[in-house]
């Protein structure tokens, strides 16, 4: 049984490649086929558990549209997933590392920007971990020349990831982009949990 500050289990469950192929094939107009690949970082990078994420359309996983680094931090009765992204001039050093982890030896904290307001609060539900972006509309994104705030959440088990990824209008809360038809449903197709180092 896990619990709300079990960073080791969360890291093991997150470590893998996830695909929503079944969802995309069942309803192509609503769902693109996306792959999310998360690789464990060496423990010393963040002084604790961390993962590197690349998210891409399955047709071109060599050109991910989202690069993130997560530091899993137990805090009181929950965990925080602290978000970082590579600076624009460092992206080429990172791109591809989720599928070629030897590249991670060249990762450097100096290449990263923190993402204020975008960290996620993670708790244990009894059967899964659930995460929601911290309250306050602070995770701002400009898309289609319009400012939005991220309204993100996820639920993860040892073999599946369900996520909602939306941008909302800061004033009206109207959904401007993202998961309009509901949650993305990803299955783990490659398991990297064996790469998670004890801490």
UniProtKB/Swiss-Prot annotation:
> Is Lyase one of the keywords UniProt gives this record?
yes
Query: Could you tell me what this protein does?
Result: Attaches a phycocyanobilin (PCB) chromophore to 'Cys-153' of the C-phycocyanin beta subunit (PhcB). It does not attach chromophore to CpcA, ApcA or ApcB, the other phycobiliproteins.
Q: Which organism is it from?
A: Picosynechococcus sp. (strain ATCC 27264 / PCC 7002 / PR-6) (Agmenellum quadruplicatum)
The processes (GO biological process) annotated in the record are: protein-phycocyanobilin linkage
Q: What is this protein called?
A: Phycocyanobilin lyase CpcT
| GO molecular function terms attached to this record | lyase activity
InterPro entries hit by this protein:
CpcT/CpeT, CpcT/CpeT_sf
Per the similarity annotation, which family is this? Belongs to the CpcT/CpeT biliprotein lyase family.
Question: Sorted alphabetically, which keywords does the UniProt record give?
Answer: Lyase
| Enzyme nomenclature, EC number | 4.-.-.-
Q: Which CDD domains match?
A: CpcT
> Which segment of the chain is annotated as a signal peptide?
none
Q: What happens when the gene is disrupted?
A: Cells are a yellow color, 40% reduction in phycocyanin and grow slowly. The C-phycocyanin beta subunit (PhcB) in this strain is missing the phycocyanobilin chromophore on position 153.
Lyase as UniProt keyword: yes
